[in-house]
Design a protein with these regions (language model features):
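C-terminal active-site rim and adjoining tail of enzyme catalytic domains
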Residues: 19-22, 98-181
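Metal-dependent phosphodiesterase/phospholipase catalytic core, i.e.
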Residues: 1-103, 118-131, 140-142
Length: 181
């Protein structure tokens, strides 16, 4: 995977947000950890499995964290339950959150509560399109932290409404609107 980094570093990581050319590159994981450590920032590490390399990805991330001796708080989140379970075996004392984009026939709200309980996940992150008062009540009764994300950034107004209903955290790609909250 490191073999391709020199090519990835050439990509303009800021263009998506700023709609113009920037000098923002895709940082290495170690660079992110160093920045977080220097600024005393905790981090959510989203496990995004590379098909066919899920185990290698998880092992590599755990190795970097251990080698770096990252001392800030962190937790792992993923839509991929298998990746979370693999990482939990390697780093059993870390915190974990299961991300849910939609309810399906093979995975219900009760299944999600059972999974969080079985694997001692501290958090469940829901797509804002599927979150409602009933989901929030059910999850809170399970003593699991609720986070919400959206394909588009949540507005401050949407976030305030979610927080008032019991959601504890939101994910955002661009937090500048939230600077003064």
């Amino acid at each position: 995977i490191d073999y391709f980094y020199k090519d990835l570093k050439k990509l303009d990581a800021g263009h998506f947000f700023y709609k113009k050319s920037t000098n923002i590159y895709i940082p290495k994981f170690e660079e992110i950890l160093l920045l977080c450590q220097n600024k005393n920032i905790n981090i959510n590490i989203e496990l995004k499995p590379n098909k066919g390399f899920e185990k290698e990805s998880v092992v590599s991330i755990a190795k970097v964290l251990n080698d770096f001796q990252f001392s800030n708080e962190f937790y792992f989140s993923s839509f991929d339950l298998d990746s979370l379970i693999m990482m939990k075996k390697i780093l059993p004392n870390a915190n974990y959150g299961f991300l849910i984009d939609e309810f399906k026939r093979n995975i219900t709200l009760n299944d999600i509560k059972d999974i969080a309980n079985k694997y001692n996940f501290i958090c469940c992150g829901f797509n804002k399109d599927i979150i409602n008062s009933d989901v929030i009540t059910e999850i809170l009764q399970s003593n699991v932290i609720i986070t919400v994300y959206s394909k588009e950034n949540l507005t401050v107004s949407e976030s305030n409404e979610l927080w008032s209903k019991g959601v504890q955290s939101i994910f955002t790609d661009d937090p500048k609107e939230f600077k003064f909250i």
